[in-house]
Amino acid sequence: MVAVVKGERLMRPADRAGAWTGFDMTIPQEKIAELLDREAIRDCIYRYCRGVDRADEVSLRGAYWPDATDQHGPYSGPVEGFFQWAHGIFESGARNVHMVGNILIEFTALKEAVVETYFLALQRGPGRDDSLRQFLIAGRYCDVFQQRDGEWRVFRRVVVYDWVEEQVAATQSEEPRFGPRLPLGARFPDDSIYDLLGRR
């Protein structure tokens, strides 16, 4: 009996003469290349999340091509302007926590892909009147990724918002609220991940 999985022939144990040594599977090189491309795109999305959560501008810039555009809430335009807008948020001392879930990658050309990434974000920082505000946001990064010189980055991003909920922000400082739960997350270069990476 032969099992067919997306065009690949997998021999079951009963089809083999002699001892069972595992599946006989040949994966075309183009399939392996596609898997590597998908993983590179996911890494880029994770790099973006580190960039915004750790106020790490090197990681953030590394997620976009220099000529990219971003439609991102109140900002829409060239990605350089988005970086400046994000820098202002970083300087305000805002706390960001981004988590990504479903990532659907659809290749539309040899070196281009449309990528839909679901996200949840907790954003806490000063409002216009300097009062502390906190939001839970759910949405999707709807991206066009391009591969250049073997690297995948965002070329066009549209952030779609599916849910926004303002929460009551705790007024107590983080140290007593977190108690013994240390170390606290921090900005670049003070977060613990940079110790492990040797990037201090």
Language model regions located:
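Extreme N-terminal basic, low-complexity initiation segments
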Residues: 1-11
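Short beta-strand edge/turn micro-motifs at domain boundaries
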Residues: 12, 20-22, 114, 138-171
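Short, low-complexity N-terminal intrinsically disordered segments enriched in polar/charged residues
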Residues: 12-50, 54, 58-63
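A solvent-exposed, acidic/Ser-Thr-rich amphipathic alpha-helical stretch
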Residues: 57-125
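Short, surface-exposed coil-to-beta transition loops
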Residues: 98-100, 136-141
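Short, cysteine-centered beta-strand-loop-beta hairpins and adjacent loop/turn segments enriched
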Residues: 122-131, 164-165
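Short, surface-exposed loop/helix-turn segments at secondary-structure junctions
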Residues: 127-135, 171-172
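Acidic/histidine-enriched, glycine/proline-rich intrinsically disordered or flexible terminal extensions
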Residues: 167-200
